[in-house]
Amino acid sequence: MMAFENTSKRPPQDFVAPIDQKKRKVQFSDSTGLVTLQPEEIKDEVFSAAMYSRFVKSALDDLDKNDSTQIGIIANQVALPSKNPERINDKNLNILLDILSSNINRIESSRGTFLIQSIINFEKWWELPPHTLSKYIYFIKILCSSIPKWWQDVSMILVSCFILPIKQTVCHHDMLKYFLRMIPSSMGFIDTYLAKFFPNKNDTRRKLVNYTSNLLKLRGYCSELGFQIWSLLIEKIISIDVELQNELDELDDDVDDDDLEEVDLEDDDDLDDDSGDDDDENCGNSNEELRSGAADGSQSDSEDMDIIEGMDGTEEYNVELTQGIKELSTKLDSILTLVSTHVEEQVTPESLESGEGVGVFNTLTTLFKTHVLPTYYTRSIQYIMFHVSQQQLELMDSFLVTLIDISFAVNEAAEKKIKSLQYLGSYIARAKKLSRTQIIFVASYLTSWLNRYVIEREEEVDQRGGMERFKHFYAAFQALCYIFCFRHNIFRDTDGNWECELDKFFQRMVISKFNPLKFCNENVMLMFARIAQQESVAYCFSIIENNNNERLRGIIGKADSDKKENSAQANTTSSSWSLATRQQFIDLQSYFPYDPLFLKNYKILMKEYYIEWSEASGEYESDGSDD
């Protein structure tokens, strides 16, 4: 119920603008015909507008006298939910915004705070009619320009609405862009808001995808926040990736990679919000089409999977885990597809020439080193670098140099070196865009380092200490063998000779005292032995058989009967490997960063950049058993 002051003492002309008494008929086009407003209706409308204008001005006059009663009435009406019929209508809102924009200093006091807050928190303001929306945005600009302290509140509201689809946040970004240029110092607290309002990993896929889309759009016009935005995205994706891997590990042998690769993702409303109004209450809900197979941010944001074969549907524990895997995988799939598609658009020959693309790549490389590489057993996040590096030959060179530098840096921790070598071997094996020159270069680097290592340290094998002392050597040798399994066809020169003299090199390595066939990943060594024998590079099966016999007899290490007793004791000690240390190394050796993806849309996006085992092995084995 609108309250008005007593206006009986004021003459009518104070309220009503002079109206031409000539009978006029105003017509508006309508889809069903013409809508006619009679002169009396026009008079009522003008009279109503004039009365409301007078009421607002009177409320401001009272506010100047420290009476905020009428301002409070207006603020309460503005603060009502959008579905409440008592909320201020668009015409009166136009009047209010016009008057306040011209009298912004009159509501600067604490008594005007509630009115300002009710306006900046106006529910679904982005859905206002264009004319009213322009007045609303103008008021916000006047407010924050005249009273800068309000920009912090406004920017927080704008960022909190990033859960809306990108089509609904056009005005949000326009205002952010405007004020980031006007008040560049505000980037500090906006950076905080970006992290604060990022949806939880257990939130809906729609919100996660929409928020990611809006962050990427913000990065497009605010390069100063670029690193913070990429860092935030990488952290959140890693969080989902790791949780997904943990849930997969909990299933143990109930589900394998083949099952996950065969899943079919379909829209399923049951896995999404129970109500479509959820986003409306938290800034809105609308439609948005994501590119390149990314899931539609406005549709039900959980895609169903086919029932995983081998699962016992009667076990509630497994059913819950399967449901969690479905939800996490669809979220991860959508976000990664969106991010990689965006990155591909940013790293073009033109952008690299201008330097902008180089900046994006360098940022992602830095975050790979600081966030991705130290995180154990991520399954999908690393494909961002896998994809972006293959956009240009120079970027692949840069990524390879990064991995080599980390793998053999003196000051790096041993675990990080081994992890980097795993990435190096997996990347060379799987990256389809790599040139032969790049592959031969890496192989040459590895063979040179391994040869030098054997020459310098082979005698240490007979000294006291466990074989874990040489895990760096084993990681490098395994990486090279893994590369050879995938790329053996390109290691012959035009005369049929082996590049890097691989035939001599491998034979020397496998018979060295380090016995790499025993301490490297068993599956990789078996496949290497099979291919090496087929290609007449090295003969390993007799050594592998001898190693297996030693294990069966419970003999750890080797014993040389020709040596003295104290030397034999040293050998036994040197060949021993504590169970915990060995298991840790085995786990690390068994990690292949670029194993096949099971995220449906993301796997499709990676297809032209990725070498399947079936493409490289020919007659050997399927991709399911290469690792």
UniProtKB/Swiss-Prot annotation:
Do the record's keywords include Glycoprotein? no
Annotated compartments: Nucleus
* InterPro entries given in the database record: RNA_pol_I_trans_ini_fac_RRN3 (IPR007991)
Keywords, ordered alphabetically: Nucleus, Transcription, Transcription regulation
Record-level Gene Ontology MF annotations: rDNA binding; RNA polymerase I core binding; RNA polymerase I general transcription initiation factor activity; RNA polymerase I general transcription initiation factor binding
Here the segments flagged for biased composition (Acidic residues) are 263-282
Main location per the UniProt record: nucleus
Biological process per Gene Ontology, one example term: transcription initiation at RNA polymerase I promoter
GO cellular component labels: nucleolus; nucleus
Miscellaneous comment = Present with 138 molecules/cell in log phase SD medium.
Please report which protein family the annotation says this sequence is part of. Answer: Belongs to the RRN3 family.
Q: How does it assemble?
A: Monomer. Interacts with NOP53.
* Known role: Required for efficient transcription initiation by RNA polymerase I. Interacts with Pol I in the absence of template DNA and stimulates recruitment of Pol I, but does not remain as part of stable preinitiation complex.
Protein name, as recorded? RNA polymerase I-specific transcription initiation factor RRN3
Tell me which species this is from.
Saccharomyces cerevisiae (strain ATCC 204508 / S288c)
